[in-house]
A protein has these predicted regions:
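Structural recognition of the beta-strand scaffold that forms the well-ordered cores
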Residues: 35-39, 72-79, 111-116, 173-177, ...
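Glycoside hydrolase catalytic-domain groove-lining segments
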Residues: 229-231, 235-299
Length: 302
């Protein structure tokens, strides 16, 4: 899903990965003391404000900072609509301002995580258009959508490549494409492609981004939905293509359920999900994280 309230990134380490070393080492050191907290679109908009309406080019406004006195460790941004050549993403955030937010957050010592909700390249619908189960197959080499998706991928790479620090060095980011792929709500999800097709999509995408475009400063993160995690093992593209494993797990208020009951159920289920994720991460020697979570509307102060 698209994080609507907030994203909380809890980074835990089971072993070191190979790239980029400085970011992985930082995550590892933090995991031994205090987990990192992340907030989606933190510098872009908040309660009754929007960076697009501000003259503050340093991107200093943050709801988290207003409440806690500090910026979140991790800033989440989404590249949906970059593939279409638009100036703003699917949330209405200007891509130029997003890039500046990433640079400012990095300069303050923060970490950037990027997701991507690409439109359905077959139907022209949104990422949530799962009406055609041939899309991934048609994107793969030999398919009629292959060239189109390569152009889309190059547009993603162009934006990521623009993220340079004040010394012109590439800013490292946690990169989380094709997420919640064990669910059925995205065109790359479990109801729209086979495990083999999904893994081939990941391999193809990775090859273009890393080997063809040379974007090495990426921590590749994969994150299934917690509700369909039994499908994760067969839809895992391989250790050489993944640097971090995550899971997206949200809080919901079921019909007839009190807020207190929902809160208790969420705490219990989160512990269960993280225990499962830890086991998978240890098996593959990867760091792991709670990559998306939240409660829409924040109707519970706890």
């Amino acid at each position: 899903m698209k994080p609507t309230a907030f994203a909380l990134a809890l980074i835990f380490m089971t072993a070191c990965t190979t790239k980029p070393a400085s970011l992985v080492e930082r995550l590892s050191n933090a995991a031994e003391t205090t987990p990192f907290y992340g907030h989606q679109d933190d510098l872009m908009y908040g309660h009754e404000w929007n960076s697009a309406d501000s003259l503050d080019k340093l991107m200093e406004r943050s709801d988290v900072k207003d409440v806690c006195g500090q910026y979140p460790a991790i800033l989440g941004l989404d590249l949906g609509y970059i593939e279409l050549g638009r100036s703003c993403n699917l949330d209405g955030n200007d891509f130029a301002l997003m890039a500046e937010a990433a640079r400012q957050h990095h300069a303050r010592g923060g970490i950037i995580t990027l997701s991507w909700h690409p439109d359905n390249p077959a139907t022209g619908g949104s990422a949530w258009d799962n009406s055609d189960n041939s899309v991934v197959r048609r994107i793969l080499p030999g398919g009629d959508l292959h060239d189109k998706f390569r152009v889309w991928t190059d547009r993603v790479c162009d934006w990521i490549e623009s993220l340079k620090d004040e010394n012109g060095k590439q800013i490292p980011v946690i990169w989380r494409p094709f997420h919640e792929h064990t669910g059925g709500w995205f065109w790359w999800g479990a109801t729209c492609c086979t495990p083999q097709e999904y893994n081939a999509l990941w391999h193809m995408f990775y090859n273009q981004v890393v080997n063809e475009r040379g974007l090495k400063e990426l921590v590749w993160a994969i994150s299934p939905s917690s509700s369909n995690r039994e499908l994760f093992a067969e839809r895992y593209p391989g250790d050489e293509y993944v640097d971090l494993v995550g899971v997206d797990h949200y809080a919901y208020l079921a019909p007839g359920q009190s807020q207190k009951e929902a809160d208790e159920a969420f705490v219990c289920s989160t512990r269960e999900v993280l225990a499962w994720l830890k086991e998978f991460a240890m098996l593959h020697g990867k760091p792991y994280a709670l990559t998306e979570t939240g409660l829409e509307g924040l109707n519970s102060p706890q």
